[in-house]
């Protein structure tokens, strides 16, 4: 039975698992194992996981978070890139019949196909993960661009990156990543995780960020690809005005500049403003105005 052994995140059991399988941490995969059961339980609580939910986990490691998810979810599909960990997970998660471990790289995986293969329809879809710091942003953007409708995404990441995701317009942390994420989801930091609860200990603290499906989505831009190009380009040089960044993005010839000025006027945005002052809605309005002027 699952209750006969200490939970996987118990520091003594974590060490025993590492020793049994001769595991060392792969720096190239950004591996840090969490050894505080209360924090794991708080992550699951932040995702509000229930038996109605199918949950995807990225990078289960030795299964500490997976175990907590399995106790509450309908089913868990855990994607693990490190083939050394597959026999470990087969062992540590053997008491839980509602877990499937899939040997996949999240950035190369066909998530829609995996969801269709491993989950029965009729359940809410959530994603919970402790992401490697070095690849957090590419994974998040991959998920948001996938077209998959996640009810909730709860991710542990570097505190500084979490602050950027949840930042409000006009703050130092607000940037293209803030806009890209907040266009799709509502974001908030649930709590901070000190670096001392990891093995090996990272150099910085982490944060748990909760992304929830928007109850009221902003109006969609006429050209989503252009909208994303505009957002990225507007923050190209943070200290420069939006106008300077627009010229770098679209060109400085008189006709283009005139069209850009007209688009700014239509969107009711001042020429001298910096990108960090614009809301998601402002960027959508400006993108639509530029497209209408033939700039994309």
UniProtKB/Swiss-Prot annotation:
S-S bonds: none
Coiled coil: none
Record: residues binding S-adenosyl-L-methionine: 32, 34, 59, 80, 105, 130
Reactions catalysed, as given in the entry: adenosine(1518)/adenosine(1519) in 16S rRNA + 4 S-adenosyl-L-methionine = N(6)-dimethyladenosine(1518)/N(6)-dimethyladenosine(1519) in 16S rRNA + 4 S-adenosyl-L-homocysteine + 4 H(+)
Main location as per UniProt: cytoplasm
GO MF annotation, one: RNA binding
Gene3D superfamilies cross-referenced by the UniProt entry: Ribosomal RNA adenine dimethylase-like, domain 2, Vaccinia Virus protein VP39
Entry GO terms, CC: cytosol
Localisation per UniProt entry: Cytoplasm
EC number: 2.1.1.182
CDD domains: AdoMet_MTases
InterPro entries the UniProt entry points to: KsgA/Erm (IPR001737), rRNA_Ade_diMease-like_C (IPR023165), rRNA_Ade_Mease_Trfase_CS (IPR020596), rRNA_Ade_methylase_Trfase_N (IPR020598), rRNA_adenine_dimethylase (IPR011530), SAM-dependent_MTases_sf (IPR029063)
Pfam families linked: RrnaAD
Keywords: Cytoplasm, Methyltransferase, RNA-binding, rRNA processing, S-adenosyl-L-methionine, Transferase
SUPFAM superfamilies noted in UniProt: S-adenosyl-L-methionine-dependent methyltransferases
Endpoints of the signal sequence: none
Function: Specifically dimethylates two adjacent adenosines (A1518 and A1519) in the loop of a conserved hairpin near the 3'-end of 16S rRNA in the 30S particle. May play a critical role in biogenesis of 30S subunits.
HAMAP family membership: 16SrRNA_methyltr_A
Family the UniProt entry places it in: Belongs to the class I-like SAM-binding methyltransferase superfamily. rRNA adenine N(6)-methyltransferase family. RsmA subfamily.
Protein name, as recorded: Ribosomal RNA small subunit methyltransferase A
